[in-house]
Amino acid sequence: MSRKCELTGVGVLYGNNVSHSQRKTRRRFEPNLRSVKFTSDITAGEYRLSVNARCISSVEKAGGFDAYILKADDNVLSGNARAIKKKIIQTKTAKSL
């Protein structure tokens, strides 16, 4: 499993630990990933995604999982999230007809 948020694309960053004497050693800054179950109101399904902690509050602020994923850019979404977005769009258009 990659250390990457499925909704925002936030991944591992690299930098230095810097001691008091200014010695630098390489380190990794890993995102605070959580496995979260999101419920879609449109498809009435539950989807488990690996997202970072900031993304959880962003989803709530956007008005729910459906609103967030419909506004999200396809370039930052994972393959799994893109498939969920496609399913939500298809269900939404089928209900509107």
UniProtKB/Swiss-Prot annotation:
GO cellular component: ribonucleoprotein complex; ribosome
Top-level taxon of the source organism: Bacteria
Coiled-coil zones: none
Ribosomal protein recorded as keyword: yes
Record-stated family: Belongs to the bacterial ribosomal protein bL28 family.
UniProt KW keywords: Ribonucleoprotein, Ribosomal protein
Keyword Ribonucleoprotein: yes
HAMAP family: Ribosomal_bL28
Organism: Rickettsia rickettsii (strain Sheila Smith)
Pfam families in alphabetical order: Ribosomal_L28
Name of the protein in question: Large ribosomal subunit protein bL28
GO terms under biological process: translation
Parts of the chain that traverse the membrane: none
GO molecular function terms noted in the UniProt entry: structural constituent of ribosome
